[in-house]
Amino acid sequence: PTAADQVLIDMQQAFRKKDRVRLAQLLPQARGHALEPWAAYWELRARLEDAQASEVDAFLQRWAGTYQEDRLRNDQLLLLGQRRDWSRFAAMHPAFRMGDDREVRCYALTIAQIEGRAPQDAAAVLRENWFAQRDADDGCTHAAGELFSAKALPAIDVWRKARLAIEANRVRAARDAVAIVATDVLPQVTQLNDAPTKFLRAHSTAPG
């Protein structure tokens, strides 16, 4: 590889190692390279949790229309959702072109529910995304909690998620679902590790 190409290779390796210092050192050397958008993405993504909103906005403006722009928007939307920064999420979400992140969809559904504009098929939208998530996730779990609290999601759907998670050997996801629908049995939820089928059979008829 050329010297310029080696810079990109080194940056990719530094990104995988989460080496922020190395990324910052190498970024100036990537300027003008055909893959500079990736270099800029790796450098900012590695420190996104600490980045200023102005830095994120500047990146999105500079690389508008690129894959990396929308990829970072996706990352930022997930971060804003985790932080419950609904106003900034709502402002950024309409520009998200890929729209293929289930957790982002669930955060958007949460906002719609909070603002009283959830679609009539909100429960179906939630199920489609939540049930497809194998691992525990904050976005769809939070949306499920919001919809369940508003009586827009039946308990049977939450228990179904718990069963699906157990079948996939995803105990944390199952525990998160149980926490929504039956907090009274949470002290016993450790049984999910030892006898998950027995636990669900005993509690899946719990009121709620």
Where do the PLM segments sit?
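Extracytoplasmic and endomembrane cell-envelope/extracellular-matrix remodeling and assembly machinery
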Residues: 1-64, 69-208
